[in-house]
Amino acid sequence: MLSKGWHITLAGEGKTANLLSAEFPAIQILPLRGYRISYPKRGWLFIPTIMLQIPKMLSAIVNEHFWLRKKMRSHAWDIIVSDNRYGLFHKKATSIFISHQIAPISGLGSMADDLLAFISIRFIQRFNACWVPDTADINNLSGKLSHAKTIPNNIEYIGPVSRMERKNVADENFILLLLSGPEPQRTILENKLLDQASRINERFVCVRGLPAENQLTPSSSNIQFIHHLKSGELNLMIAKSKLVICRTGYSTVMDLIKLGKKAIMIPTPGQTEQAYLGKRLKEMGWYTLQVQQKLDLSKGIKQCIDSQYQVPPFNFDTYRKVIDQMGIQ
């Protein structure tokens, strides 16, 4: 959209806003309160902790909707693109909801899943369109997360999306530890990885997913630490690595597929979406899967290096046709 000369406004807060500002310093970022979900230290507490915060999430959805109605009086946006935020739709704009999780997995059984899907679809159908960054065919990434038995009538599969580009660079024979996600699980995984990596005869680069300021850098002879990388720098770092160890975040999966990079996936404990996605990718023969509670880094690295996993080719340009069909010139 920027390349087509459109005026873009972003909205967010905290770490999200800081990352957007670093990537797009010339774009205005409006403060918009996030859902501010807190996460437990123990994975088995994840579902009850989230369930207890449902009233807070519903309140946040209502608040963001009224925030948008107020901002529309002064900005009058033509198009609103909502990244998984259910309240950001407006009748005077083309409102687009983006998500790969149309039918959330509760971890509480099929009845709970059906109820969540029903509620999710009711919200999504208030938008003009629902864009799913995946393919519609059987050879898809997200499985039943976005190919459920019931889907919104405004859904459009726009193909996987990634800003990464394949690089013609030499493999520098290091393993990339790519940390991300909410605390405290980000730090828990970091500590587990560093403890085991320090005893393995390999060279590691650890991108911690943290802002550089006020952060202490751990010490290790075979591990290089980087607090944060912009997308272009991260693109090059992934391209130069021999394999990546990371969470099963959907954006990360799309990036790795586009770059054709081997990876060990470690789902965030308790996050049913990541657990499902990691299991699915392993069963399809695409990636190596490790469970955080039973992490065996040495075994996982050997499996990943020795694997003959083949990810089929995906078209990462489908979304461009979808944007063109909207008349964005």
Predicted regions and their residues:
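Conserved nucleotide-sugar phosphate-binding/catalytic loop shared by glycosyltransferases and other
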Residues: 4-54, 224-225
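Short, polar loop motifs at secondary-structure junctions
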Residues: 13-18, 80-87, 162-163, 207-215
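Conserved nucleotide-sugar donor-binding subdomain of glycosyltransferases
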Residues: 45-87
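Active-site-proximal region of nucleotide-activated glycan assembly enzymes
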Residues: 91-157
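Donor-nucleotide binding loops and adjacent catalytic segments primarily
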Residues: 145-147, 156-243, 253, 294
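Nucleotide-sugar donor-binding patch of glycosyltransferase catalytic domains
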Residues: 225-228, 258-307
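A donor-sugar binding/catalytic signature common to diverse glycosyltransferases
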Residues: 233-276
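C-terminal amphipathic helix plus adjacent low-complexity
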Residues: 298-329
